[in-house]
């Protein structure tokens, strides 16, 4: 079986695709599937149409049995050809705007199978099917999420012994991730021993080292699909404070050291205080395994879906 994975062009990453797409592809490869990648270049909706010829050339070269497009707009490029069956994964951005939702949903009806990374994304899609779909979050590569003993990690990173370090789950400038809410909550604590770090421009291994060293991972986000950064924090057994959006509450479960906060800065302050007082590691990694959200298991489910589609041809 040969599968071509498609996503939006991101020049700052290897193979010009978001890391989780590559990680999923490599996990699929372990199940005996031949995998290749195609990045949709250009800006704006028109680029998804104009890239059709480039995609057809890639199809001619690679001869895939199936195409798996990540994000609805990439799915538009994929279904502009009818030679190869298409699976499309919706991650969240498809439902954030009216026109994006309409376009992504409309073109998704031309795919053979839909994957939604969380139930709320299926619920929000304007046009949806009653069958040939699954709710399946992306998995976490436990081989990449390496746990380092906390004190060793802190020494290697040069962390100060009298500081409490919080890793914010995104770039400070990303308004959707909502750093101002975290800052407002921390300011209410009136503590000078807290330092917040930005998750930006870091490799998976760097993130794992920081998560192993940090006292807390914070994600006061306004909107998500099924957040990979949160799953990585869980896989590194880092205490977590996060808002109840998307599937976050389900992911965190009732694991000790996981705290759900509201959008009230006072509640954020209270949960941050509790998480810092927890002063231990969680069993988040066990929770990831319990949910079946390792990359290997998610890849196995995808290969089963691919096989079903090809057997119906």
Map each language-model feature to its residues.
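Short His-centered aromatic/hydrophobic patch
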Residues: 69-74, 90
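Acidic anion/phosphate-binding donor-loop and adjacent secondary structure
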Residues: 99, 140-156, 162
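Conserved donor-binding/catalytic core segment of Leloir-type glycosyltransferases
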Residues: 159-177, 183-186
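Short alpha-helical donor nucleotide-sugar binding micro-motif in glycosyltransferases
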Residues: 209-214
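Aromatic "clamp/platform" in nucleotide-sugar-dependent glycosyltransferases that forms part
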Residues: 222
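Short hydrophobic beta-strand element within catalytic cores of glycosyltransferases
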Residues: 239-242
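Conserved acidic donor-binding segment of nucleotide-sugar-dependent glycosyltransferases
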Residues: 254-266, 273-278
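A charged, aromatic-enriched C-terminal amphipathic alpha-helix characteristic of glycosyltransferases
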Residues: 277-311
């Amino acid at each position: 079986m040969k599968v071509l994975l498609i996503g939006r062009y991101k020049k700052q990453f290897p193979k010009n695709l978001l890391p989780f797409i590559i990680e999923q592809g490599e996990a699929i490869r372990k199940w005996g599937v031949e995998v290749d990648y195609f990045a949709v270049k250009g800006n704006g909706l028109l680029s998804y149409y104009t890239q059709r010829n480039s995609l057809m050339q890639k199809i001619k070269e690679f001869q895939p049995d199936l195409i798996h497009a990540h994000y609805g707009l990439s799915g538009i490029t994929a279904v502009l050809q009818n030679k190869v069956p298409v699976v499309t994964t919706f991650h969240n951005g498809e439902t954030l705007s009216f026109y994006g939702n309409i376009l992504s949903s409309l073109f998704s009806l031309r795919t053979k199978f839909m994957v939604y990374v969380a139930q709320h994304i299926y619920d929000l899609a304007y046009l949806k099917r009653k069958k040939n779909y699954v709710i399946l979050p992306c998995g976490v590569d436990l081989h990449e999420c390496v746990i380092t003993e906390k004190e060793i990690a802190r020494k290697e990173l040069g962390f100060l012994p009298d500081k409490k370090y919080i890793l914010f789950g995104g770039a400070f400038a990303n308004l959707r991730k909502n750093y101002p809410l975290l800052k407002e909550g921390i300011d209410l604590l009136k503590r000078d021993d807290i330092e917040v770090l930005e998750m930006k421009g870091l490799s998976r291994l760097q993130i794992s080292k920081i998560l192993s060293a940090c006292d807390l991972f914070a994600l006061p986000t306004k909107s998500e699909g099924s957040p990979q950064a949160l799953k990585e924090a869980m896989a590194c057994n880092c205490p977590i404070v996060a808002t109840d959006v998307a599937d976050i509450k389900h992911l965190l479960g009732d694991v000790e050291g996981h705290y759900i906060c509201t959008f009230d800065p006072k509640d954020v302050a209270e949960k941050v205080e509790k998480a810092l007082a927890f002063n231990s590691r969680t069993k988040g990694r066990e929770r990831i395994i319990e949910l079946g959200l390792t990359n290997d298991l998610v890849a196995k489910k995808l290969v089963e879906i691919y096989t079903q589609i090809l057997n119906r041809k």
